[in-house]
Amino acid sequence: MKRKSWELKLIFLVLVAVFAIFLAVPAIRLLLKSFLGEDGLTGAYYLDVFSGKGFTTALGNSFAVSIVSALVAVGIAFVMAYIIHYTRLPRGFKRFVQAVATLPMFLPTITYGFAIIYSFGKQGLITRLLGHQFFDIYGFGGLLVGYVIYTVPVAFLLIHNTMGYVDKKTLVVSKAMGDGTLSTFWIAILRPLLGTLAGAFIQAFFLCFTDFGIPASVGGDYEVIATVLYNEMLGGVPDFNRGAVISVVMLLPSIVSILLLRFLERYNIRYDRISDADLRRNPGRDTAWGLSGTVLAILILCMFVVIFVVPLVERWPYQTGFTLEHFQEVFSDNELQTVYLNSLGMALATALFGTLAAYGAALITARSKLPGWCKQVIV
């Protein structure tokens, strides 16, 4: 027992050191950079940024598109999770819905931008098939579509996981008590999920607020705070002090998010025992939810079909003949092969060390008898 306690303490110290070196120290240096000028401490950089042309507009744009995107993403994620847990649809269909819901998380966000362009642009695949462009892809519309696809997997995993721990017999009890459909839906499904739904919204909002890949490809003239930061740090004349100010502003929502998530934990419902009840047969319910899941799955897949179609076309959209020339060019380019191998190596290393860190943190917070303050530090 003593050995186990010693091992957990060692894991705790290693995690604290890792978080301090790679998270706390850079954050502190960033904060100091935003206040330190040639003559010492100053707030001039903050005044300069907030009074500058376009910053407040970009900040407002970021909040607007992030809030709307997060709301839509949580709604879609809820529907797809509901189909899996609260319908009697075939198991194969449920697995298909789950696979589609998590598919976008395996692609980088800048890929979503290209997928939107090649799908919904004036010469996009879907636009050409339907003969009409439904929305302007450069600006709010493109950002909304990209952000929603980007954040649906995270919101889905949170809601899907929580639904698995909701006692299904609450549905039976609510019906036995004579509650109406809406009352049962609130009591047995929505009420136990309130904390998770709010948490999913916060996570989706923060991911949208800080993402750069999607605005870089389809942002257009609709400037958001991520593109402002890029222009300050990697523009013609980098300004690290102003960039630090913008970075601090971007970090503030994450701090608020953490505080809100801590607050929302008190609304989570904990069951002494979870029991699973067979859902009643309801063809109308299953048909409606099945159609909803099918439509959502098709819309998500349509976004990514073009990624597999365009590389096999001679010259999209003018020469649509089949060719493998593009693949041959890529695989024969030694520099691209080196870049690909470097990316693969970094991804494997990140996955390995990230998994170890997450597992160690889970051991400390859920399976150790260390003091409460130790667990709070990790969380």
Give the positions of each predicted feature.
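Short, Lys/Arg-rich N-terminal segment immediately upstream of the first membrane anchor
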Residues: 1-7, 187-190, 279-285
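Alpha-helical transmembrane segments of integral membrane proteins
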Residues: 259-292
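Short helix-to-coil transition segments within interhelical loops
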Residues: 51, 163-193, 368
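Membrane-water interface segments at the C-terminal ends of transmembrane alpha-helices
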Residues: 7-38, 53-164, 192-213, 245-261, ...
